[in-house]
């Protein structure tokens, strides 16, 4: 089955206790039921700067437990390898806030 890409709005984002990397997102995916996705991107973003953003998620992955929390999907990001360095930078894919939650990407 094909991946289902949807616009999602970040309602809440918090650092997962006892985890250096994980952020827990509470997302509006247009269904009327909040969706939880965990993402190991705390090195790149502080949770509060992501609230209110419109992101892209793959929403038809089976739930996966991380630190005891069900993560229901995956957020899309772009990774750039920094020149002359082992480091990479990660950017969550953010889209125009006019795009409604749940809009399907083709």
Predicted regions and their residues:
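Phosphate-backbone binding interfaces of nucleic-acid-interacting proteins
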Residues: 1-106
